[in-house]
Amino acid sequence: MCIRDSANAVLHGFESSDFDNLTMYSEVLQDSAIELLDQGKLAFASASSITVSKPVYDKILANIDHYRERIVLRPQEISNAPEIVRRLGIIGINTALEFDIYGNVNSTHVGGTHMMNGIGGSGDFARNAHLAIFVSKSMAKNGDISSVVPMVSHVDHTEHDVDVLVTECGLADLRGLAPRERARAIIQNCVHPSYRDALQDYFDRACQRGGQTPHLLEEAFSWHQRFNETDSMQPAKSPARKAA
C-alpha cells in the first residue's frame, strides 16, 4: 500500500466494509492504518516506517503495549523485498498521478517534469504483487486535469505491471487484455464523462492508422500542452467540468 490521499481513501473505505481480520504488508503506515487497527478491521500491520499525524503519534506512544502486539517495523530491504512480496501473494494498492489509455502509470512527475514525490517501493509491489491495483481520482484541479490521458508524460510503471486501474467512475481489469482491449476498458470505466468523448475520439482516430498500440504521435501530449497554455485540458470551459 502506497501513501497519498487516494490510497488513504481506499483504507478509510474498509471501515464500513464487510472485511475483517485483514493484514497489511506495506512500506509506510499512516493514520488510516492505525484507525483500522483500532476498529479491529486490521489484525496486524507490517511496514518499514510509520508516518502519522501528531494526535495519532501521541496515541501510539500512550498505548505502546497495545500497538507493539499489532505492528512490526522491518528494514526496507525486507519490507520491499520482491521475493517476499511475491511469496506472500499480496494485493498491492498504489496511487497514480495519471495513467494512459493503455495502462502505463505516472506516479511521481507532474506534467512529466516536476517531481511531486518519489517512487518509493511501488515498483517492487506492482511488479511482484499477486494483484497490482492503481487508484486515482479521474480528474484534478477542479476538473481542469484529466487523470487519464492519451499518453502519460512520465512512466514509472509500464502496462505490463498494472493489473487493475480504479477511479471513482469505475474500474478496468486489464489482465489478459490486448492493448486495444485495455484502451476500451479504461475509457469506458475509468474516464470522467467530461473527458470520455474526447479520449474516445483520440483512440478511434488512432485505430484508423492501425498498429498494435495505436497512437497519434502529433497529438499524444496535446492534452498536457493545452493545460500549459490554457490552465485546462478541456478544449473549452464547460459547466460539467466546474460542477465536478
Annotate each predicted stretch with a short phrase:
Residues 1-3:
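Short, small-residue-biased leader/transition segments that mark boundaries at the very start
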Residues 5-244:
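Conserved phosphate- and dinucleotide-binding cores of soluble alpha/beta proteins
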